[in-house]
């Protein structure tokens, strides 16, 4: 391995590979250190429609399409007494679509694409420590996990895309805040011989609410379906204390939900069950001098709306654009970092409001759609709530633009919203895990209005964050808006 590089990327998942591809194409020397060997298994199979635009930007869409993944034209929700579908398009008439993917396959495609665009990728290399000049990281020590060989590499800029491990956030900054309400356990397996019901759009994900959480059902191109359960950690722990095994909990929940039981009545579970914690968190800052934190390394949200891949890749696009323009002296590093951190956190918080609406303050689907309408800025008229909901959860809303000029007001309101849902450690012990009070519900609506005043990931001069917006042509970077806030 070389002793120095322009850009060091920790992690080769979607955030890391997206940033690596874009920066390598801009002529930077890019080194990716990935602790696993791809292909490797990963959860997060359901992609929003915005993924197609990312694949186009990366120049990898043909490779993704040729893999044969299921095209996802929307989703079907059954939550308490209500049910509805979100439809982005249709195979016969066209329109927007995402994908239902095997992540081991997709992530491998994206990382190999980074290589083909000039990035140097090393696997299985883990970063054991970072070296700093004040607050600025400038070098990393690494270990090759197979041989135990060690070494170091210096860099100009760091992109921490290390996933939930979060090298910067957990080891150095220690600035993660966990959401006390969204602390769940996810467990899942893969089935063959199933029969899907004739509901929802083509290739839809099924999101099915249960008393202590929800099911996902995702059709995959390899002839299997992914059937998973996300369950409140306390409910899960109570079942375990009563002597139920993971397998017993999984199968009993399936048997208790008629739709899922019918889907699997003649099916065979062809894998072992897998599980992991789904504890939502947000970082107080997503960047600092010489570094950007992208994807799950910065923020993780309950997977209810399938936003993980979307947030990871869009944060990577903006981080790459900021680094490109900083390096060309087009923008100041400090203002670019501030714009990046604000834009990414607000993207996260907008989805968090919708998830909170489902989990904590459920008064029927119209309540959910109204929250979406408040946060949508795509000229959705009053009452067209389902359209607003579709715009946001497809990820297309984020593509339109990233902000308007009222950033100072939004930033202060966003901080208040963060304090409500992600208390600092000193407050956690005092926070009961209960639904929001009427006062807190009213506050949340105020915070939603604050989010409503700011678009995400600006791509026009009229919609800039801190006066900056992302451009992808003729070169990737960020430009300054002449518009006065």
Give the label of every model feature segment.
Residues 237, 241-322, 327-350, 355-356:
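FAD/FMN-dependent oxidoreductases across multiple families
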Residues 113-260:
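Predominantly flavin-linked oxidoreductase catalytic cores and closely associated redox partners
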Residues 24-43:
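Glycine-rich FAD pyrophosphate-binding loop
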Residues 42-80:
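N-terminal FAD cofactor-binding segment of flavoenzymes
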Residues 92-112, 237-244:
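Short beta-strand to alpha-helix junction loop
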Residues 16-17:
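N-terminal Rossmann-fold NAD(P) dinucleotide-binding loop
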Residues 2-13:
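Beta1/beta-strand and adjacent pyrophosphate-binding region of the FAD-binding site
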Residues 324-485:
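C-terminal helical "tail/cap" subdomain of flavin- and related membrane-associated enzymes
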């Amino acid at each position: 391995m070389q002793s120095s590089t322009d850009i060091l990327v920790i992690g080769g998942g979607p955030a890391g590979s997206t940033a690596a591809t874009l920066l390598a194409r801009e002529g930077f020397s890019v080194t990716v250190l990935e602790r696993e060997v791809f292909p490797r298994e990963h959860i997060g199979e359901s992609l929003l429609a915005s993924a197609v635009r990312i694949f186009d930007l990366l120049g990898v869409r043909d490779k993704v399409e040729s893999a044969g993944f299921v095209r996802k034209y929307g989703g079907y929700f059954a939550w308490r007494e209500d049910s509805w579908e979100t439809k982005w398009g249709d195979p016969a008439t066209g329109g927007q679509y995402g994908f239902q993917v095997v992540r081991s396959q997709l992530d491998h495609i994206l990382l190999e694409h980074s290589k083909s665009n000039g990035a140097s990728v090393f696997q299985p290399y883990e970063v054991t420590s970072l070296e700093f000049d004040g607050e600025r990281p400038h070098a990393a020590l690494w270990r090759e996990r197979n041989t135990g060989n060690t070494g170091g590499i210096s860099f100009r800029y760091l992109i921490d895309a290390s996933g939930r491990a979060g090298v910067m956030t957990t080891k150095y900054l220690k600035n993660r805040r966990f959401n006390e309400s969204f602390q769940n356990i996810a467990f899942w397996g893969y089935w063959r011989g199933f029969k899907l019901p004739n509901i929802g759009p083509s290739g839809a994900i099924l999101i099915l609410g249960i008393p202590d959480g929800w099911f996902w059902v995702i059709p995959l191109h390899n002839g299997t379906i992914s059937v998973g359960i996300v369950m409140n950690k306390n409910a899960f722990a109570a079942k375990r204390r009563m002597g139920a095994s993971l397998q017993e909990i999984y199968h009993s929940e399936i048997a208790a939900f008629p739709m899922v039981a019918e889907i699997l009545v003649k099916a065979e579970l062809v894998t072992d069950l897998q599980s992991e914690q789904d504890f939502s968190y947000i970082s107080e800052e997503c960047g600092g001098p010489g570094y950007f934190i992208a994807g799950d390394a910065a923020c993780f949200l309950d997977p209810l709306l399938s936003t993980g891949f979307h947030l990871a890749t869009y944060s990577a696009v903006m981080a790459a654009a900021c680094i490109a323009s900083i390096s060309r002296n087009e923008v100041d590093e400090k203002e670019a970092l501030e714009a990046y951190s604000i834009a990414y956190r607000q993207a996260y918080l907008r989805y968090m409001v919708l998830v909170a609406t489902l989990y904590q303050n459920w008064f029927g689907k119209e309540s959910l759609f109204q929250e979406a309408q408040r946060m949508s800025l795509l000229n959705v008229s009053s009452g067209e709530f389902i359209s607003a909901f579709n715009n946001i959860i497809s990820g297309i809303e984020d593509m339109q633009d990233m902000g308007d000029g009222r950033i100072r007001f939004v930033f202060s309101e966003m901080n208040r919203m963060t304090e409500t849902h992600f208390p600092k450690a000193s407050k956690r012990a005092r926070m009961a895990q209960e639904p929001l009070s009427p006062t807190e519900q009213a506050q949340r609506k105020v915070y939603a209005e604050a989010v409503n005043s700011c678009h995400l990931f600006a791509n026009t001069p009229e919609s800039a964050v801190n006066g900056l917006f992302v451009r992808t042509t003729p070169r990737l970077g960020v430009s300054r808006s002449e518009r006065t806030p």
